[in-house]
UniProtKB/Swiss-Prot annotation:
It comes from Homo sapiens. Gene3D superfamilies: Calcium-transporting ATPase, cytoplasmic domain N, Calcium-transporting ATPase, cytoplasmic transduction domain A, HAD superfamily/HAD-like. This is Phospholipid-transporting ATPase IC. Keywords: ATP-binding, Cell membrane, Cell projection, Disease variant, Endoplasmic reticulum, Golgi apparatus, Hearing, Intrahepatic cholestasis, Lipid transport, Magnesium, Membrane, Metal-binding, Nucleotide-binding, Phosphoprotein, Translocase, Transmembrane, Transmembrane helix, Transport. Component of a P4-ATPase flippase complex which consists of a catalytic alpha subunit ATP8B1 and an accessory beta subunit TMEM30A. The flippase ATP8B1:TMEM30A complex can form an intermediate phosphoenzyme in vitro. Also interacts with beta subunit TMEM30B. InterPro entries: ATPase_P-typ_cyto_dom_N, ATPase_P-typ_P_site, ATPase_P-typ_TM_dom_sf, ATPase_P-typ_transduc_dom_A_sf, HAD-like_sf, HAD_sf, P-type_ATPase_IV, P-type_ATPase_N. The gene is ATP8B1. Its cofactor is Mg(2+).
């Protein structure tokens, strides 16, 4: 890469739209380099001189250096980094891991520091300090300290338990042992003693202790089998292999002890599937990639032993690099709740300021002229008002609820357990329960507006069955419609003549077998031979049976189909592949494997036949294959027609083709291929470019059709979610026609749906942009917004758009380098200014076009995006989040869905056939798409209702409690005197009112789960934020204000001129405080009873138990015995017994409670009678509804014959095993069975006439 960057020139993008899809990387992270050179490095000829020449430029990108068996090398001064002041530590981490936060000395200070970083805790700490100032505080210090200690203590105990568990886990892991080369031989050492550069030996079933370079193993060609469940959740075995040179020379202990290889590689990062480096040894350089690295956390399987060199240790390993930087998601209610707390704090400041002004005025008018109020201080009224301001901040501090956040977390934790325990979301077939992987998002499940779903494996089963094929223009398979149930009338094809048949494929077209056996049409045999040879499947034998492991379920189905039709893939080595062709074993030399990726959408293999001919066999999506066909292909149109038929039946298709290659052509191409294979930078891009040169002028053989059935309950689930006003977008890598037909099959699209395509959308967006430009352009930010609709009102519309159209519409075109020449780095101020203005114009235009697209798409009832990459999926989700401010949910099952799952507000992973990456990145997971309706319509809705009720009640009870002080201040000279006993203030939120509201937040439900599913329209209240918003908040505030007025003024009126039974007036302050407190506790607990919709014994016990607990504690605290022990803390001696023995006091309490509650009862009655909600109506008739017959699920059927659409499918978004295969590693016989083996299926019977 040139360093003369100032003179470097590039070309800007073309001004015209380009429909070519941008080749995104599926797994980009923040650790990747932004700018990389595109030049292909020349082929290395493996001699010392060129190795040394290539070593220096390689260091510019690969700066991590490892010397084998040389610990002193890594301790050199230039590898030391300054940690603190003069304390230095090595750049290379040791292998001891530390996941715990605290030790015995740091726990208390660090935990307190972390907790006081939260604003609420810091606020109450400041109040506690203010209470220590006697001139300010009228409250005892413990009124704030006890609640604060409870909150801090609960959190500290939870943190301590978690950290102790981490300590134990770290100790257990760090003390594991393995064998390390020391003093020339292997010795047992603990993991924590391992260092970078050590050579270690691992045995079968051992965990890999660090990221190591595989040097050799007990397997042929040093192949090593590993299980990566701790890394990506996948339990199927993966394959790693060493370099050929290390396999050859590093098998014995003595050679391993003298190994002095030097490695330069990338710095530690979090990319699990990427590694770039070079080994320099024996005067030669060898490129290294991820297939040669064993990562920490893997388990050695089916391999007796292996040797490795430690590259990254401890905190530098990839699994540890991935343990942090988790994206923290917060709910809409979280943000709203925080704003409301800020609002309460502002109200607190204003009330305190007003009362302080009142006190200053009162002091000037009354206090200074009343000799009996003189306290010996000659402070001015304004200064006294200043002190009283802080006094009221303390007295009214309970307006800001200290226990709110702790209570919310407890409720969310309980709701998460309810999801985990729900047996109706348990999938018995795979023993997979639903799992809430986060506890912070439950109520947001009740507010979803848009669902973004993958198709394959999410809506469908991802179990592939070979169904039909088209060979040389002839269609083979079942021609009957799915509605015709006459399978029994046609005999299933008998594959008993084939010794390699697995007996699982159900096929009904006997004519195809006749064609294969007769050999009359050589294209038929060529077709199945291609399926048997063009793949990256791995094979082994178990009990005499062939077991295949494929990179995707599609590929496994195709290889199994070829096996059943007489072309069985038997074995492969570095340079050969062995096929049984109708019982005859033939071995072919493999010259090159052109592997699949999500941008190429195809794979090829180049082989030399035993006769010496060179052939290329290719399979891929029809869109890319047809672009590369030779112009003379007589069956091209017939195959297109067959693809249309397959698409109409929602079958997944791909095309097969081949070409013969001349020896000279291959020799020239192979040189370029070898050069690209050893490139140190941009290796993948270089290989793709070379692949393009050979994959052209192909001859079409035919097409395959694979069935991927819908999961059970998908149409019903989509129907119910649509009735809940949730819009569903399907984002898939499949061909447009396949996705469209699946849309009809799952009833996302109907006969009444008007479908808009990319070209329609483009014209609509262009017209909208013109209108906006005429009104002032994209910069007309201050013009009044004009709400326009893209479509006339009425009608059911859907949008189907491909990834290429999406790029064009959103101005995400691939850069063309043949139009506008510009300087990469402007050298003058004018150039810099012009470039900045150009960027701003383009960005504004892009933003406006994106907004218009989102507005248009959201007017449709359904959206299907086809042929989209993982990055495009995430981009679509982000656009809806950004411009519609709507709550989004993304659901998928594969690694290509991880980006959108992380981008959406809620991510749901389905544990299916494509591993566990989606599940591990998700917030919630389960096994079937149909469980989504229960997650949202039952658990999500319940959680939302419960949280809203909890918050409204919590704010209400705190205002009712606190504002009594406000009213009391008008009668005590605004002196910040409290209206309650100090211990009542301390325990009110902790004991007297905490349990009922917690139980309501955990258990309440307005209607049952069955009725929630039966009436999806109930879900709308969460989408519209009807149960918790600023209006509801101020209603709760007003309710609390009125309650506090009633609770204060009724007892005040009763006490003004009252004589008790003993002839004495009970109008002392302490009796007055007891009366208000008693009425308050009864009122707020009965109020929660009015708010409770679902009664259980636990709810009733908590309400009446809280009231009983209040009276029990009050009588104890007012007893003479406790006053004798703590005279200064308990000063209400005998007050409860003296006051509450007066019938007039009880009458006052009952009157206050009744006046508080009866208006609420009346309003609720009138509201339910005159303006009933949907929930009210269902509750009113719930007995009748419960007695009615439950709705029956409709049988899932595919809707055939909707229209004739051509279909093709995309492979899964991951590479296969081509790198491993071409690196020369034969496959060991002992292997686990194929995970995605083709299941029993029903093939269709179809035969067309001769073309």
């Amino acid at each position: 890469m040139s360093t003369e960057r100032d003179s470097e020139t590039t070309f800007d993008e073309d001004s015209q739209p380009n429909d070519e899809v941008v080749p995104y990387s599926d797994d980009e992270t923040e650790d990747e380099l932004d700018d990389q050179g595109s030049a292909v490095e020349p082929e290395q000829n493996r001699v010392n001189r060129e190795a040394e020449e290539n070593r220096e430029p390689f260091r510019k990108e690969c700066t991590w250096q490892v010397k084998a068996n040389d610990r002193k090398y890594h301790e050199q001064p230039h590898f030391m980094n300054t940690k603190f002041l003069c304390i230095k530590e090595s750049k290379y981490a040791n292998n001891a891991i530390k996941t715990y936060k605290y030790n015995a000395f740091t726990f208390i200070p660090m935990n307190l520091f972390e907790q006081f970083k939260r604003a609420a805790n810091l606020y109450f700490l400041a109040l506690l300090i203010l209470q220590a100032v006697p001139q300010i505080s009228t409250l005892a210090w413990y009124t704030t300290l006890v609640p604060l200690l409870v909150v801090l203590g609960v959190t500290a105990i939870k943190d301590l338990v978690d950290d102790v568990a981490r300590h134990k886990m770290d100790k257990e892991i760090n003390n594991r042992t393995c064998e390390v080369i020391k003093d020339g031989r292997f010795k047992v050492a603990k993991w924590k003693e391992i260092q970078v550069g050590d050579v270690i030996r691992l045995k079968k079933n051992d965990f890999v202790p660090a990221d190591i370079l595989l040097l050799s193993s007990s397997e042929p060609n040093s192949l090593c089998y590993v299980e990566t469940a701790e890394l990506d959740g996948e339990t199927n075995l993966k394959f790693k292999m060493s370099l050929e040179i290390t396999d050859q020379y590093l098998q014995r202990e003595d050679t391993l002890a003298t190994f002095d290889g030097f490695i330069e590689c990338e710095e530690p990062n979090n990319r699990l599937d990427k590694f770039t480096g070079t080994l320099f040894w024996r005067n030669t350089s060898f490129p290294l990639d991820a297939d040669k690295i064993l990562l920490r956390g893997c388990v050695i399987r089916n391999t007796d032993f292996c040797h490795g060199l430690v590259i990254f240790a401890g905190a530098d390993t990839k699994i540890m690099k991935n343990s942090g930087k988790t994206r923290f998601k917060r709910t809409k209610i979280d943000y709203l709740m925080n704003y409301m707390v800020y609002t309460i704090f502002v109200v607190l400041i204003l009330l305190s300021a007003g009362l302080a002004i009142g006190h200053a005025y009162w002091e000037a008018q009354v206090g200074n002229s009343s000799w009996y109020l003189y306290d010996g201080e000659d402070d001015t009224p304004s200064y006294r008002g200043f002190l009283i301001f802080w006094g009221y901040i303390i007295v009214l501090n309970t307006m800001v609820p200290i226990s709110l956040y702790v209570s919310v977390e407890v409720i969310r934790l309980g709701q998460s357990h309810f999801i985990n325990w729900d047996l109706q979301m348990y999938y018995a077939e795979k023993d997979t329960p639903a799992k809430a992987r986060t506890t912070t998002l439950n109520e947001q499940l009740g507010q979803i507006h848009y669902i973004f779903s993958d198709k394959t494996g999410t809506l469908t089963q991802n179990i592939m069955t070979f169904k039909k094929c088209c060979i040389n223009g002839q269609i083979y398979g079942d021609h009957r419609d799915a509605s015709q149930h006459n399978h029994n009338k046609i005999e299933q094809v008998d594959f008993s003549w084939n010794t390699y048949a697995d007996g699982k494929l159900a096929f009904y077209d006997h004519y195809l077998i006749e064609q294969i056996q007769s050999g009359k049409e050589p294209e038929v045999r060529q077709f199945f031979f291609l399926l048997a040879v063009c793949h990256t499947v791995m094979v082994d034998r178990t009990d005499g049976q062939l077991n295949y492991q494929a990179a995707s379920p599609d590929e496994g189905a195709l290889v199994n189909a070829a096996r059943n039709f007489g072309f069985a893939f038997l074995a492969r080595t570095q340079n050969t592949i062995t096929i049984s062709e109708l019982g005859t074993e033939r071995t072919y030399n493999v010259l090159a494997i052109l592997d699949f990726n999500s941008d190429r959408k195809r794979m090829s293999i180049i082989v030399r036949t035993p006769e010496g001919n060179i052939k290329l066999y290719c399979k891929g999506a029809d869109t890319v294959i047809y672009e590369r066909l030779h112009r003379m292909n007589p069956t091209k149109q017939e195959t297109q027609d067959a693809l249309d038929i397959f698409a109409n039946e929602t079958l997944r298709t791909l095309c097969l083709c081949y070409k013969e290659i001349e020896e000279k052509e291959f020799t020239e191409w192979n040189k370029k291929f070898m050069a690209a294979s050893v490139a140190s930078t941009n290796r993948d891009e270089a290989l793709d470019k070379v692949y393009e040169e050979i994959e052209k002028d192909l001859i079409l053989l035919g097409a395959t059709a694979i069935e991927d059935k819908l999961q059970d309950g998908v149409p019903e689930t989509i129907s119910k979610l649509a009735k809940a006003d949730i819009k569903i977008w399907v984002l898939t890598g499949d061909k447009k026609e396949t996705a469209e037909n699946i849309g009809f099959a799952c009833e996302l699209l109907t006969e009444d749906t008007t479908i808009c395509y990319g070209e329609d959308i483009n014209s609509l967006l262009h017209a909208r942009m013109e209108n906006q430009r005429n009104r002032g352009g994209v910069y007309a930010k201050f013009a009044p917004p004009v709400q326009e609709s893209f479509f006339p009102p009425g009608g059911n519309r859907a949008l189907i758009i491909t990834g290429s159209w999406l790029n064009e519409i959103l101005l995400e075109k691939k850069t063309k380098r043949n139009k506008i020449l510009k300087l990469k780095f402007p050298r003058t101020e004018e150039e810099r200014r012009m470039r900045t203005q150009s960027k701003r114009r383009l960005e504004a235009k892009k933003e406006q076009r994106q907004k218009n697209f989102v507005d248009l798409a959201c007017e449709c009832s359904a959206v299907i995006c086809c042929r989209v990459t993982p990055k495009q999926k995430a981009m679509v989700v982000d656009l809806v989040k950004r411009y519609k401010k709507a709550i989004t949910l993304a659901i998928g099952d594969g690694a290509n869905d991880v980006n959108m799952i992380k981008t959406a507000h809620i991510g749901v992973g389905i544990s299916g056939q494509e591993g566990m990456q989606a599940v591990m990145s998700s917030d919630y997971s389960f096994a079937q798409f149909r469980y989504l309706q229960r997650l949202l319509l039952v658990h999500g809705r319940w959680s939302y209702i419960r949280m809203c009720k909890f918050l409204r009640y919590f704010f209400y009870k705190n205002f009712a409690f606190t504002l009594v002080h406000f009213w009391y201040s008008f009668f005590n000279g605004y002196s910040a005197q409290t209206a309650y006993e100090d211990w009542f203030i301390t325990l009110y939120n902790v004991l007297y009112t905490s349990l009922p509201v917690l139980l309501m937040g955990l258990l309440d439900q307005d209607v049952s789960d069955k009725l929630s599913l039966r009436f999806p329209g109930l879900y709308i209240v969460g989408q519209r934020d009807l149960l918790f918003n600023y209006k509801r908040f101020f209603v709760s505030l007003l309710h609390g204000v009125l309650t506090s007025m009633i609770l204060f003024f009724i007892p005040l009126g009763a006490y003004l001129q009252t004589v008790g039974q003993d002839g004495e007036a009970p109008s002392d302050y302490q009796s007055f405080a007891v009366t208000i407190a008693s009425a308050l506790v009864i009122t707020v607990n009965f109020q929660i009873g009015l708010d409770t919709s679902y009664w259980t014994f636990v709810n009733a016990f908590s309400i009446f138990g809280s009231i009983a607990l209040y009276f029990g504690i009050m009588f104890d605290f007012h007893s003479a015995g406790i006053h004798v022990l703590f005279p200064s803390a308990f000063q209400f001696t005998g007050t409860a017994s003296n006051a509450l023995r007066q019938p007039y006091i009880w009458l006052t309490i009952i009157l206050a409670v009744a006046v508080c509650l009866l208006p609420v009862v009346a309003i609720r009655f009138l509201s339910m009678t005159i303006w009933p909600s949907e929930s009210d109506k269902i509750q009113k008739h719930r007995k009748r509804l419960k007695a009615e017959e439950q709705w029956q699920r409709r049988q899932q059927v595919f809707r055939r014959g909707v229209s004739t659409r051509r279909s093709a499918y995309a492979f899964s978004h991951q590479r296969g095993y081509a790198d491993l295969i071409s690196s020369g590693r034969s496959i060991r016989k002992k292997r686990s069975p194929l995970d995605a083996i083709v299941a029993d299926g029903t093939a269709e019977y179809r035969r067309t006439g001769d073309s």
